[in-house]
């Protein structure tokens, strides 16, 4: 079956450009263009948006983004072998696809884009988590992007959207949910990828809130959450002891039982504690 964009099927593209997946680049490709179109739709209405795609590889998701109407796609790819395949896509969508060859961890794509900007990526898990944390912790809020639509290992996706009370709830959940609305919008079995990874995957869609859910200084909140979850089995009066000599009183003032553990504490209480700490004389 020929694709709606008139380009060849992805299996053919991969064979022609000898794009055999390399493990060290975390390459697990999506070859089903119906699926990549569905992921592109999960990113929201792309018409009138510039989209940053990180790790386009042979371009399945890139084709989905363009077919779903993205105004402009800026694709950052580390593997030079993918560039000829991406150039063919750029020719099929004149003026709408720009490809940068490089490491997404080292490139600032902003110079190339006009808001509104959405970010979409199917990346190796470690690169994806590092970029997510950077995108969630800019110097100022709101950030330059409107939404992030990112593929993760399912277990990592569950940590991003986790609620208090379970093992999945930790720093990543607090960081993500403090300033975004985060949802799992799709789960994918290993067979959706070539080659198939060992684990299930999930797409998380994060929409930037105009401001944080509850006021707090980001650095203080980060300190509280890091200390609390680094020793998540300990009671907070012990795990947070190093933050302030009067930590028990500050916990009580924030409405938190000093005997509680970090994984029982919701965002609102963490923020109240961060405010109390910031205001407390030492
Ligand atoms: N988006 C394609 C798809 O869905 O079929 C490819 C996904 S594959 C999981 C990850 C892609 O990210 C590969 O093309 C790989 O070369 C690229 N990649 C890995 N590390 C990268 C980095 N640091 N910067 C940019 N691209 C990277």
From Swiss-Prot:
It is found in: Cytoplasm. It holds the Pfam family RrnaAD. It catalyses: adenosine(1518)/adenosine(1519) in 16S rRNA + 4 S-adenosyl-L-methionine = N(6)-dimethyladenosine(1518)/N(6)-dimethyladenosine(1519) in 16S rRNA + 4 S-adenosyl-L-homocysteine + 4 H(+). One of its GO terms (cellular component) is cytosol. The keyword S-adenosyl-L-methionine applies. The keyword Glycosyltransferase does not apply. S-adenosyl-L-methionine binds at residues 28, 30, 55, 77, 103, 122. Keywords: Cytoplasm, Methyltransferase, RNA-binding, rRNA processing, S-adenosyl-L-methionine, Transferase. GO terms for molecular function: 16S rRNA (adenine(1518)-N(6)/adenine(1519)-N(6))-dimethyltransferase activity; RNA binding. Its EC number is 2.1.1.182. CDD domains: AdoMet_MTases. Specifically dimethylates two adjacent adenosines (A1518 and A1519) in the loop of a conserved hairpin near the 3'-end of 16S rRNA in the 30S particle. May play a critical role in biogenesis of 30S subunits. Belongs to the class I-like SAM-binding methyltransferase superfamily. rRNA adenine N(6)-methyltransferase family. RsmA subfamily. This is Ribosomal RNA small subunit methyltransferase A. The lineage of its organism: Bacteria, Pseudomonadati, Pseudomonadota, Alphaproteobacteria, Rhodobacterales. The gene is rsmA.
